[in-house]
């Protein structure tokens, strides 16, 4: 066990702590308090009084609360480390001082020694002093056990090092790992910064349905559920795209939604079935303006949490300073493989050339566009360390994007790659309802033939397009991957508070 407590010892510890909770009750003290009035937080005190001299005391009334992370008792003195959300501070507890300030409680110091444990949540009042050894401390006058913990924290030597257990018991992970708390603070700062920027640019956020009658907006396998009263199947959304486009049809010219997406697919360091994305739509612009918006959103987020655009991710120096490199998918593949796929008109000839270049070609590869994408994913994607816009995708893999205005067979689409990973996807949105119907019907045929990720025909969406959708640029950014990048987190599970995990038999956590 990573936390060094056996199942039997855990039961013994729990039983002992239950007894301590009962002892508090017998003294008329509630081991699960209702409130505690707080005047300061630990980090504020550390920063405000960092210049306090050793041995100096400040006549400042302090009331704080937090979790006991460590405790040392030496005769008539005790030193606790208390952690609140902001940080830690030492509690300096003296027998005589507690006796003076807590006369209603017989032998308050001995009771403190007897009934408190690491993990308990404690409230204290007192003044502030720096000990002779230089530790800023709350010089405690009164205390109260606010929550009696029943289970022990992982010991300080081993910590919580089992990765699977860290994800499964995130609440313990957050208690003992300050860097994990910092990751989720930064995640909140990133989403707040993105929303602030869009708000200043005149965008509004509108929530669209999570439960949908049709699954569309991306090539992905949906989760299916059933509405009992209506007697109909429903799908958890795999994208917000089609509903946000309906809003553009309805007259919202700058609209976005930042929210959860659900895809019934595999789990990896980059994929979780439930994840967060932001989709942004702006009328009267194309994918060129969306590239500028992507640069603005990512750099705004980086500045908000790091204060710089030169970052390090997993040991790789990455410069987020715009403008970012732009290269077509055809050009990128040709640079890496020497093959100009735009010259091919025959699929079989192209497959032979790809195979000769070491590109794995699926037997059922249906088109030159799909083959180009296979070549890109295998030979190019992993090389794109610095932020790079890959532009102008094949129409065969982009059923919702507008045809390229000067390159037949391609669409006006880009994806942003950083550290070999896709971070954003964008189109000049397809607004021709006849072309859109044709493409969705082709997707539906693929679905009928067994492709579980192909699009359905969303008749209501097509009806909306027939009322007329203005020229529109659309953008999607994976928030989880952006947070990974800006917090130097190797796995998507590190940036999702409660990632999806396999079922675990009762008790196997220890």
UniProtKB/Swiss-Prot annotation:
A Pfam family: tRNA-synt_2
Entry protein name: Lysine--tRNA ligase
Organism domain of life: Bacteria
Family indicated by similarity: Belongs to the class-II aminoacyl-tRNA synthetase family.
Residues that, per the record, bind Mg(2+) 1: 415, 422
Reactions that this protein is recorded to catalyse: tRNA(Lys) + L-lysine + ATP = L-lysyl-tRNA(Lys) + AMP + diphosphate
GO BP annotations listed: lysyl-tRNA aminoacylation
Cofactor note (record): Binds 3 Mg(2+) ions per subunit.
GO CC annotations on file: cytoplasm
Presence of keyword Ligase: yes
Sites where the protein binds Mg(2+) 2: 422
InterPro entries: Aa-tRNA-synt_II, aa-tRNA-synth_II, aa-tRNA-synth_II/BPL/LPL, Lys-tRNA-ligase_II, Lys-tRNA-ligase_II_bac/euk, Lys-tRNA-ligase_II_N, Lys-tRNA-synth_II_C, NA-bd_OB-fold
GO molecular function: ATP binding; lysine-tRNA ligase activity; magnesium ion binding; tRNA binding
UniProtKB keywords: Aminoacyl-tRNA synthetase, ATP-binding, Cytoplasm, Ligase, Magnesium, Metal-binding, Nucleotide-binding, Protein biosynthesis
Quaternary structure, from the entry: Homodimer.
Record's subcellular location: Cytoplasm
EC numbers: 6.1.1.6
Cofactor(s) of this protein: Mg(2+)
